[in-house]
Amino acid sequence: VYKRQYKNRDYDTAATLLDDFRRKFGRSAFIEDAEGMYALCFYYLSPGPSRDQTMTGQALIAINEFMSRYPHSEQIENFKTINTELTQRLHDKAYLNAYTYYKIGRYKSAIVSLKNALKQYPESSHREEIMYLIVDASYRFASNSVAEKQTDRYLAMLDSYLSFKEEFPESKHIKEVDRMAQHARDYLDRNKQEDNNI
């Protein structure tokens, strides 16, 4: 029955039937195929990165369970490829969520979200872009802040800048972040002189 649902691309129903089969017939000769199909159901149900990634998380769990139970399966290379693809989808989703805040000018929220994306997925393929956006959002956030908060925010921006420059010294964004850092330093120098004159 589950094979018919699977072939008809009714992956929700197939996953339910396959899960039932796995629980009832765990010692069956067909269990490896059933568990592979079960994992693939979630893969096929997983949407693109712009949508909710709950199914992607379930797919990764099912695929990793399959790979740990059947490390010598004929399907293992296919599942490794799928695992990489789904992980990339989660990285893309985290990046897109953070970028949305940046795009609409919510720089404080963007900074938090971008840092969380890096913390959650430090190996993300978007790492350079995320770190650049942290610098840029921090710069914009500091520039648009009230005077009494600008000093601390420019200092935080310079910390992000130094981290970015250390990790990506050859980035296409280097000239731009250097310009932002120089502006921040100029502001801090002027502000320091004004404080000394008081």
Model features per residue range: what roles?
Residues K3-I198:
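Acidic, polar-rich low-complexity tracts and alpha-helical solenoid repeat scaffolds
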